[in-house]
Curated annotation (Swiss-Prot):
Signal peptide segment: 1-28
Database matches in InterPro entries: DEFL
Single GO biological process annotation from the record: killing of cells of another organism
Source domain of life: Eukaryota
Name of the protein in question: Putative defensin-like protein 139
Annotated Gene Ontology cellular component terms: extracellular region
Species per Swiss-Prot/TrEMBL record: Arabidopsis thaliana (Mouse-ear cress)
Keyword annotations of the record: Antimicrobial, Disulfide bond, Fungicide, Plant defense, Secreted, Signal
Protein localization: Secreted
Disulfide topology: 37-81, 46-65, 51-75, 55-77
Segments forming a coiled coil: none
Originating gene: LCR7
Family membership: Belongs to the DEFL family.
């Protein structure tokens, strides 16, 4: 499976299992558990074929919360957070 397909599969899976402690995504409006997400991704980390969604997922293994933004039309993600 190509890396991009793995990412989309993971996003689909995490959306289905978000109530079971998986990663949850929000666009624009942070959830209550995301208020203290300060770790920022830099522009260089979000390259054209690896936009903020996949970039944030790869970095999430470090724990905590990640705030990410990429202004390209297909690459808009503001917050990711691991729910406890």
């Amino acid at each position: 499976m190509e890396p991009s397909n793995q990412i989309f599969f993971y996003l689909r899976r995490s959306k289905l299992l978000s109530g079971l402690g998986e990663i949850r995504m929000a666009k624009g409006q942070p959830l209550g558990t995301m208020e203290r997400c300060y770790d920022m991704l830099t522009w260089g980390e979000c390259v054209p074929d690896n936009c903020a969604f996949s970039c944030a997922l790869k970095r999430h293994g470090k724990g905590g919360c990640i705030k990410a933004y990429d202004n390209r039309p297909a690459c808009v993600c503001y917050y990711t957070c691991l729910r406890s």
